[in-house]
A protein has these predicted regions:
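Transmembrane helical segments that form the transport core of multi-pass membrane transport proteins
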Residues: 102-216
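Juxtamembrane and boundary regions of transmembrane helices in multi-pass small-molecule transporters
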Residues: 9, 48-92, 97, 231-281
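Membrane-interface helix termini and inter-helical loops of multi-pass transporters
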Residues: 36-51, 80-82, 164-177, 204, ...
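Hydrophobic transmembrane alpha-helices that form the pore/transport pathway of multi-pass ion
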Residues: 1-27, 38, 204-222
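Small-residue-rich segments of transmembrane alpha-helices in multi-pass membrane proteins
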Residues: 17-29, 89-102, 146-161, 264-270
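Transmembrane helix boundary and interhelical junction motifs in multipass membrane proteins
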Residues: 29-36, 117, 196-207, 232-241
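Structural signal for the C-terminal ends of transmembrane alpha-helices
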Residues: 3-5, 71-76, 111, 127-135, ...
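Structural signature of hydrophobic alpha-helical transmembrane segments
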Residues: 27, 53-65, 114-124, 156, ...
Length: 281
């Protein structure tokens, strides 16, 4: 939003592209999404094993997302802009430290360091640095408390429903049998619908026992829960955070416009990425 406004262009196309890619580009690495971490924890796969299975579906999802966004937003991406002078960091030392921490996150994840440890160390380093140099920037308001409470409530609701037959019902909806293309698509679409109804994290946890009959079904479920939550504004944690940032940035998000774009794009994304998964079995 800041970059778009500095350039004097309409922020909506870039905001929509950000939330789409935050979801669809998260398939490639096991640390890119909490649902990916849940799958890796379930299967015990290494980073190499996961990437070996998901590289093609992830690249297909990324390419199709960019193509769809270009088509859906073509009228908004017309015109010229002047390139402004780059902004000067308020604190160069903090800026360089933050860049270094971000650059080290990827290699640390790939080398197999537990994600929780990487995240905690990175957060601690930056928190200490800000406490020393810009203490006023550290506020409890930076923590998205409403998001935390909402997500916990969704987990509790799904847990209660599981005790009252949710898993059996989801098994009927998602289907069973050999891993045909049809069953993988059914699993992916079930995950997408569930994600848009409740949120992709509780949706994945609820459907994981149903899809655990094979690694391919778990990956199809991951495709559904990562690519699917682009229709409702609560479909994923990324979407919830994005909406909160849009609100704080004075950008009004039209749920209708968001939902229409998602309703057009999600089925195409699910079919193409699931087909790529099926072809690389």
């Amino acid at each position: 939003l800041t970059a778009a406004r500095r350039l004097g262009v309409r922020p909506w196309p870039f905001a929509l592209a950000t939330v789409w890619l935050a979801n669809t580009a998260s398939l490639l690495l096991p640390v890119s999404n909490l649902t990916n971490l849940l799958l890796v924890d379930r299967t015990g796969w290494s980073v190499a094993t996961y990437v070996g299975r998901m590289w093609l579906p992830a690249l297909v999802a990324l390419g199709v997302s960019v193509l769809l966004l270009a088509l859906l937003l073509r009228r908004d991406l017309v015109g010229r802009y002047e390139h402004p002078d780059p902004p000067v960091p308020h604190d160069r030392a903090l800026f360089r430290l933050a860049v270094a921490v971000c650059l080290l996150l990827g290699p640390a994840f790939v080398l197999g360091v537990p994600p929780w440890l990487v995240g905690c160390v990175a957060a601690l380093v930056l928190a200490v640095a800000f406490a020393v140099r810009r203490r006023s920037e550290l506020r409890l308001g930076l923590v998205p408390w409403q998001l935390v409470v909402t997500t916990l409530a969704l987990f509790l609701v799904v847990g209660l429903l599981e005790q009252h037959g949710l898993t059996a019902w989801l098994t009927t909806v998602a289907g069973s049998g050999p891993d045909s293309l049809g069953l993988l698509l059914r699993t992916a679409f079930t995950g997408a619908v569930a994600s848009n109804l409740v949120n992709n994290l509780p949706a994945y946890l609820a459907l994981e026992p149903v899809a655990s009959s094979s690694p391919d079904r778990l990956l199809a479920l991951l495709i559904g829960t990562n690519l699917g939550p682009l229709i409702t504004l609560w479909g994923s944690l990324a979407t919830l955070l994005w909406r909160d940032r849009c609100r704080s940035g004075d950008l009004t998000v039209s749920w209708t416009r968001f939902a229409v774009a998602g309703a057009i794009g999600v089925p195409i994304l699910l079919v193409t990425s699931t087909l790529a998964l099926w072809l690389t079995r």
